[in-house]
Amino acid sequence: MEQSIRSIDGSRSLSNVGASLIDRESINQRALQLLQRNRRRRLLLNRSEDKARYIQPERSASSQQIHPPEHHISAHERITKARGTRYKPTDLALAEIRKYQRSTDLLISRMPFARLVKEVTDQFTTESEPLRWQSMAIMALQEASEAYLVGLLEHTNLLALHAKRITIMRKDMQLARRIRGQFI
């Protein structure tokens, strides 16, 4: 492309630049024409499966039976096709676990957590001297609390697996806190 713009002596010539612009414009025009022609063709295609839904079959006087269309698709098949593939709950759970293990985002919403922190601190302070929180302090507290909860749930899951179960129960959580040396 650079070669077509330069003239024989190496300097740029406007005639070559103008020619390349005209070539680009003609290519764009041709592409637009092809696109419009394809759109018109798609609109003109016969859609027999759509017509079969709305056009009533012809009834002859000799027979009152209506034959169903040969390519009949049940409503259930249509719905499942529209939805796409359905995954097993275990596959969905594993995909969700992988998603959250990859991310480093906080899982508890910021505003409800901040309200909870302020509510708890209001119980331990007097009304005359309310305690104020910086946003960074609340974020640090949220990071620490989420790390604590994740660790506790990991230990709880290990205890459930040790009991040959995959469902965590209250007794697993209590035992995990007791082993850690925390109150039940």
From Swiss-Prot:
| Positions with biased composition (Basic and acidic residues) | 68-80
Q: Which UniProt keywords apply?
A: Centromere, Chromosome, DNA-binding, Nucleosome core, Nucleus, Ubl conjugation
Q: Name one GO molecular function term.
A: DNA binding
* GO CC, alphabetical: CENP-A containing nucleosome; nucleus
Tell me which InterPro entries the record gives.
Histone-fold, Histone_H2A/H2B/H3, Histone_H3/CENP-A
Segments of this protein annotated with the region H3-like = 82-182
Q: What is this protein called?
A: Histone H3-like centromeric protein CSE4
Q: Which organism is it from?
A: Kluyveromyces lactis (strain ATCC 8585 / CBS 2359 / DSM 70799 / NBRC 1267 / NRRL Y-1140 / WM37) (Yeast)
